Amino acid sequence: GEFMVGSSNAFVVRPFGFHLDVPGNPGAADASGSVFTTAGKPFTASLSAVVWEAGDDSDADGLPDANGDLADNALAPNFGQETIPEEATLTHTLVAPTGGDPGSLDGTSFAGFSSGECSMSDVSWDEVGIVSLRAALKDHDFLGSGQDVQGLLPHVGRFIPARFSVNSNIPEFDHACSGFT
């Protein structure tokens, strides 16, 4: 065979996706699932920029499949070491209860990747139920290429109430008798 000999400029390859991990998350799919934590309590979420594997991209679109398991993909260790380092954010979608309050997700900015990984210990969700978490580049544009890097964790929870508020209810009675004749 023939070989190409020479050199080229340095090049960068976009990570295939983010593996998103929430330690201790039982991944409950409904109200009968195991409890993860209480509403509003901080938890840890970790993002790992990973490389492509055929089994996670069945439609060959360059993005992880919705059911893709990126946990075993190799790391993209240089992610986050760009001249202007890329950053990622988390968003959430309410999975259960249907019609529930989607609440607010805090601690969603991931910056300072090291060896392709970043972990935040102050992520919190202020409601009860189950959410899905989606990771994406903060600007949705890897190094000006127009391409995003994404990851999905379909079930995080079950989150339960942190406390209940009890108010006293002292009834007042109206006069019950009508006038006499």
Identify the function of each model-found stretch.
Residues G1-T181:
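Core sequence-specific DNA-binding domains of diverse transcription factors
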